Amino acid sequence: MVQLTWPHAKTDWAPMLDEITETYNEMTATIRKYEDLLIVGEPNNDTWARDHGFITLVDDQGGAKLLDFCFNGWGEKFEADLDNAINRRIYDEGKVKGEYVDCLDFVLEGGSIESDGEGTIFTTSCCLLAPHRNQPMAKAEIEERLKRDLCAKRVLWIDYGHLVGDDTDGHIDTLVRVAPNYTLLYIGCDDEADEQYDDLKKMEEQLKTFRTLDGEPYKLVKLPSPRPIYEDGERLPATYANFLIINGAVLVPTYNQPDLDAEAMKLIGEVFPDRNIIGIDCRSVIKQHGSLHCCTMQYPRI
């Protein structure tokens, strides 16, 4: 099941509500072909289900633990009290199934972590160590908390790669995604004149040093960066890494850049050969500095 938290006139989407609703309707129609859908309505501050939704763990017997972490508007940048109450509400209403686990003493957004399902958590230093999240906890303390709550063996920290226009302090789901067969898909940049070039190059070099738990290098697949997109003179954090994996398909954000959209979809399709690759125009979504994966949260069938 996939959760979408719906935009409305009391959110920041108000000036472009018709435009974003059209995009959400397209996402809804596409996802419903493959999975059940949970639509969450008011009250909510915003619509980024990836960050305020439960983070789910599934055990070997198929049981689920629904981890309810604190969401504080990406380090107290925005109001989040209503979003932070959504998980308890949908759990009490019976819309999600599993064991409720209260983790509200720790700030963690779903978009800030990636897991390989085998014990490794990937995250970014600039996000999890950012002010107004879990300070005064030190990096080592945060790492131990992640390993404990997420039943992980280790945490790999990425120290580079912040996208211009990103107000999450560098969520990993805009930069690096985990795929089958020890594959990491990551955003690259070949234009030395691009302001993101140096940082993304450093990220690429760091990824080359990472090893699996068996000591082998990861298979790295470089996704293109979309050409810069601006709104009111400010660059928006468009990225192809923010794709959504669902049963039978991968939904890929596109930006009306046919050559790069097609290249990204081809590369993602090669990594997920057993799934349909479907493009979703996300030019509306990035006007609020997120994309496809950010809008959604998955839950297992229990």
Residue ranges and their predicted role:
Residues 1-302:
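The feature marks the mature, well-folded catalytic cores of soluble enzymes
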